[in-house]
UniProtKB/Swiss-Prot annotation:
Name of the protein: Glycine dehydrogenase (decarboxylating)
InterPro entries reported for this sequence: GcvP (IPR003437), GDC-P_C (IPR049316), GDC-P_N (IPR049315), GDC_P (IPR020581), PyrdxlP-dep_Trfase (IPR015424), PyrdxlP-dep_Trfase_major (IPR015421), PyrdxlP-dep_Trfase_small (IPR015422)
PANTHER family cross-referenced by the UniProt entry: GLYCINE DEHYDROGENASE (DECARBOXYLATING) (PTHR11773:SF13), GLYCINE DEHYDROGENASE, DECARBOXYLATING (PTHR11773)
Induction description: By glycine.
Disulfide bond positions: none
Leading EC class: oxidoreductase
Coiled coil: none
One GO term of the biological process aspect: one-carbon metabolic process
Residues recorded with modification N6-(pyridoxal phosphate)lysine: 708
Cellular component terms per the entry's GO annotation: cytosol; glycine cleavage complex
EC numbers: 1.4.4.2
Oligomer and partners: The glycine cleavage system is composed of four proteins: P, T, L and H.
Purpose of the protein: The glycine cleavage system catalyzes the degradation of glycine. The P protein binds the alpha-amino group of glycine through its pyridoxal phosphate cofactor; CO(2) is released and the remaining methylamine moiety is then transferred to the lipoamide cofactor of the H protein.
């Protein structure tokens, strides 16, 4: 039969690229699970009353090339003015070697958070380098492996200050009046839910205020002034007040480390170490503190430990501080951080080294001195005598200056009374400085750059002598070796080889949705039209961003069944926090601010109780029945007991137990009956899209993990995006922003992220995914994700029983394998199986969540039947190995499972094991071998001997 032109054009071609199993493989799997079709399987699994009758109207699919062309046309509407706005965001030069070999490399961007350190040593080393950069520049003892942005780091610093404060009755937090406005905005939002009073005043007046537990200072103020706070910090410390300092990472190359001046906590943005502005993000924040406060720090911390053979190995340290273990008692709700961006900043420091960084910082400062000298020579007044890269210039004809700047396609900071702000950066040239002279002075100023340079080179007083750094930085060999592109390329490749990412094998982590991050989706993030915009540029310069964000929001509204979407939260945990704040403020608007009880099922992800605690709520746990479902009797009892104090329930759907609960609508109705709101966690949205939706189910608010369902890569632990969808009654209560008015949002609420649209520059990834898949492809993706999970469950059921199933013995898009009976019989644990999978070339499934002693498997729709069968065969082979232990062929203390993973060096070492080398490293005929570089980590040693900076030089010799 002759095909039509429409068929030949094949606008849905990308659907077949994204979905792993082809039609024949899908039919084989359907036969294996006993279903006639994808629709029939979906109909059996998803409760009838929540199935959508018609698919969401998000349009037809587009080819990769058509979608790229369409998005390019949208991006071209953005105007790329030269930005001197500053305020914590500057233009950068990302070294091409890092752009090509990391940012554009799936070996880096498709990896997961390094919970399995044996397959993560490369990015762990890069993160350890990031921590070393932080330690050297801040002068403190302990650093984290990144936070979400500078403003949220400030909020975390405030919370940490209260945790460690000895002034237990003090409840006021002082913020210096010249911190960045977006930082103050986020601090105020967090303080409100914690019940702290925020005082904003001149830093020198801090001692006039009583009952202050913590202080936030900014070393280089928002309008550019360098502050020497040494004496003030000393006085504050004598009064037992915890001092936090916000610092500029490039300025720290030249300026005294705040830690040396007595600061307890130092944080800031690492954006200017090679990460484009991207209309606000994603960017990594750095965070450091004194050693005595290490167990109160937020976020991931990378530590040096030992493996089973005594070799140096890296791991995430002190995880007992974090939400996945401590839940509502965690230091923070942080789950995703900004690993990919931290690693870009880390490698930027490695590539330039201390000499290169000083050259960059000195060049920026020299050009700033030249600009200052020329302006002063012509009679303009600078508001501050001491500065690094930012001038606050008083101008009589401000309107005229701004008009000339606009004509020259220049953005100055314009929100300062009777003055303009000018921040220079590493992209600034002498030609740029001449252009600034023209804008500020007119064309006939007669100034000469070389003449001014000679003047300021010998007589620069813009940095106080006491504020000049007098210690060496980045002395470790890693920062002093890889300065040629050849060396740098090989170093990055050596790190990449140590890790297991999606470019090598499926990553079957339950609750994580490690699906394809298609190349076509990734391409737009490096387009300068998206990468080079300042988040606070005039809105008419960001029309492309606004159009793209509006389209994406409209699609998400239709896919979720909500009425509005807020794009600001820059992680899933931030989305939870923002959604809960919307609920809190909604209740307050109805004079029901007393509603503060949040019901959370026992199976919930750890971020849920941690976020509820951050939002000022009390957590009450609801039991689950023997089938893993929410116990309706217990729910009713807890809701009735809470009564007028019930704020909400946080529920995940499908549940974290991997099933579609039949009573989800009844759960919503019970909570609504008692005046509560329903927060439906979007972690498992990949099993809803096109089939059902949170709004249709009856929820009021959800966050969406764009880094799960909508294809933003995990980046080894970030970036993520967690926009929230809300019903109309909650829309007035989503986050706002103090600097930028968010179009279409009537909210007057505070911000939860530094930038108005969070990590805006990665939103094109999700735009591309939805545009290329269309309604048809999105539904099919959900259906194939369900098929793949049921195929794995059915084939592994006899070897590893599936703990929870729904109607007809089916699972949703993931399944929980119960290892507990095997452990009782044989002594082999879920940990042993997870580590043995490494020898077979696989990342482990999620261990012991949501049930201890289990493995949760989520294959996603992107994995083909060939890869699923390879994983299944590996699991069945491992089961056969367990049977060998059970039969006594191998002793429990010496077998391929408890000794896993095996590394190359073992092949040439003495071999005294009762199994062969071949069984150890080439089990079941593994062909494409992945070699871990370390054996099993010693977690206890790592936490008892905490060491979180680069390993000693001897390790490099």
């Amino acid at each position: 039969m002759t095909q039509t032109l429409s068929q030949l054009e094949n606008s849905g071609a990308f659907i077949e690229r994204h979905i792993g199993p082809d039609a024949a493989q899908q039919q084989e799997m359907l036969n294996a699970v006993g279903a006639q079709s994808l629709n029939a399987l979906t109909g059996q699994i998803v409760p009838k009353d929540i199935q959508l009758a018609t698919p969401p109207q998000v349009g037809a699919p587009a080819t990769e090339y058509a979608a790229l062309a369409e998005l390019k046309a949208i991006a071209s509407r953005n105007k790329r003015f030269t930005s001197y706005i500053g305020m914590g965001y500057t233009a950068v030069q990302l070294p091409p070697v890092i752009l090509r070999n990391m940012l554009e490399n799936p070996g880096w961007y498709t990896a997961y958070t390094p919970y399995q350190p044996e397959v993560s040593q490369g990015r762990l080393e890069a993160l350890l380098n990031f921590q070393q950069v932080t330690l050297d520049l801040t002068g403190l003892d302990m650093a984290s492996a990144s936070l979400l942005d500078e403003a949220t780091a400030a909020a975390e610093a405030m919370a940490m200050a209260k945790r460690v404060s000895k002034l237990k009755n003090a409840n006021r937090f002082f913020v210096a009046s010249d911190v960045h406005p977006q930082t103050l905005d986020v601090v105020r939002t967090r303080a409100e839910t914690f019940g702290f009073e925020v005082i904003v005043d001149d830093a020198q007046k801090v001692l006039d205020h009583q009952d202050v537990f913590g202080v936030l200072l900014q070393q280089v103020g928002t309008t550019g002034e360098i502050h020497d706070y040494t004496a003030l910090i000393s006085e504050l410390k004598s009064r037992k007040i915890v001092v936090s300092v916000a610092a500029d990472i490039m300025a720290l190359v030249l300026l005294t480390a705040p830690g040396k001046q007595g600061a307890d906590i130092v944080f800031g943005s690492a954006q200017r170490f090679g990460v484009p502005m991207g209309y606000g993000g994603p960017h990594a924040a750095f965070f450091a503190a004194k050693d005595e406060y290490k167990r109160s720090m937020p976020g991931r911390i990378i530590g040096v430990s030992k493996d089973a053979a005594g070799n140096t190995a890296l791991r995430m340290a002190m995880q007992t501080r974090e939400q996945h273990i401590r839940r509502e008692k965690a230091n923070s709700n942080i789950c995703t951080s900004q690993v990919l961006l931290a690693n870009i900043a880390s490698l930027y420091a490695v590539y330039h080294g201390p000499v290169g960084l000083k050259r960059i910082a000195n060049r920026i400062h020299r050009l700033t001195d030249i600009l200052a000298a020329g302006l002063q020579q012509k009679g303009l007044k600078l508001r501050h005598a001491h500065y690094f890269d930012t001038l606050c210039v008083e101008v009589a004809d401000k309107a005229g200056v701004l008009t000339r700047a606009e004509a020259a396609e220049i953005n100055l900071r314009s929100d300062i009374l009777n003055a303009v702000g000018i921040t220079l950066d590493e992209t600034t040239t002498r030609e740029n400085v001449m252009q600034l002279f023209n804008v500020l002075l007119g064309d006939n100023h007669g100034l000469d750059i070389d003449t001014l340079d000679k003047d300021v080179a010998h007589d620069s007083r813009s940095i106080q002598p006491a504020m000049l750094r007098d210690d060496e930085i980045l002395t470790h060999p890693v920062f002093n070796r890889y300065h040629s592109e050849t060396e740098m390329m090989r170093y990055m490749h050596s790190l990449e080889r140590k890790d297991l990412a999606l470019n090598q094998a499926m990553i079957p982590l339950g609750s994580c949705t490690m699906k394809l991050n298609a190349a076509a989706e990734m391409i737009p993030i490096t387009w300068p039209e998206f990468a080079e915009l300042h988040p606070f540029c005039p809105p008419e310069q960001a029309e492309g961003y606004q159009q793209m964000i509006a389209q994406l929001a409209d699609w998400l509204v239709k896919l979720t069944g909500y009425d509005a979407v807020c794009m600001q939260p820059n992680s899933g945990a931030q989305g939870e926090y923002a959604g809960l704040l919307a609920i809190r403020h909604y209740h307050e608007s109805r004079n029901e601010g007393h509603r503060d009880i949040c019901l959370i099922p026992a199976s919930a992800h750890g971020t849920n109780p941690a976020s509820a605690h951050m939002a000022g709520m009390q957590v009450v746990v609801v039991a689950c029945d023997k089938n893993g479902n929410i116990d309706l009797t217990d729910l009713r009892a807890k809701a009735e007991q809470a009564g007028d104090n019930l704020s909400c329930i946080m529920v995940t759907y499908p549940s974290t137990h991997g099933v579609y609960e039949e009573t989800i609508r009844e759960v919503c109705e019970v909570v609504h009956q008692f005046g509560g709101q329903v927060y439906l966690d979007g972690a498992n949205m990949n099993a809803q899209v096109g089939i059902t939706s949170p709004g249709f189910i009856g929820a009021d608010v959800s966050h969406l993990n764009l880094h799960k369902t909508f294809c933003i890569p995990h980046g080894g632990g970030g970036p993520g995006m967690g926009p929230i969808g809300v019903k109309a009654h909650l829309a007035p209560f989503v986050p706002g922003h103090s600097v930028v008015q968010i179009e279409g949002m009537l909210t007057r609420q505070g911000a939860v992220s530094a930038a108005p649209f969070g990590s805006a520059s990665i939103l094109p990834i999700s735009w591309m995914y939805i545009r290329m898949m269309g309604a048809e492809g999105l539904k099919k993706a959900s259906q194939v994700a369900i098929l793949n999970a049921n195929y794995i469950a059915s084939r592994l059921q006899d070897a590893f029983p599936v703990l929870y199933t729904g109607r007809d013995g089916r699972v949703a898009h993931e399944c929980i394998l119960d290892i507990r009976p095997l452990k009782e019989e044989t002594g082999i644990s879920e940990l042993d199986i997870a580590k043995r999978l490494i020898d077979y070339g696989f990342h482990a499934p999620t261990m012991s969540f949501p049930v201890a002693g289990t493995l949760m498997v989520e294959p996603t729709e992107s994995e083909s039947k060939v890869e699923l069968d390879r994983f299944i065969d590996a699991m069945l082979a491992i089961r056969a190995e367990i049977d060998q232990v059970k039969a006594g062929v191998w002793p429990l203390e010496d077998n391929p499972l408890v000794n896993a993973p095996h590394i190359q060096s073992e092949l040439v070492a003495e071999w005294a094991h009762p199994y062969s080398r071949e069984v150890a490293v080439f089990p079941a005929g593994v062909a494409d071998k992945y070699w871990p570089t370390v054996k099993r980590l010693d977690d206890v040693y790592g936490d008892r001997n905490l060491f979180c900076s680069c390993v000693p030089i001897s390790e490099y010799q």
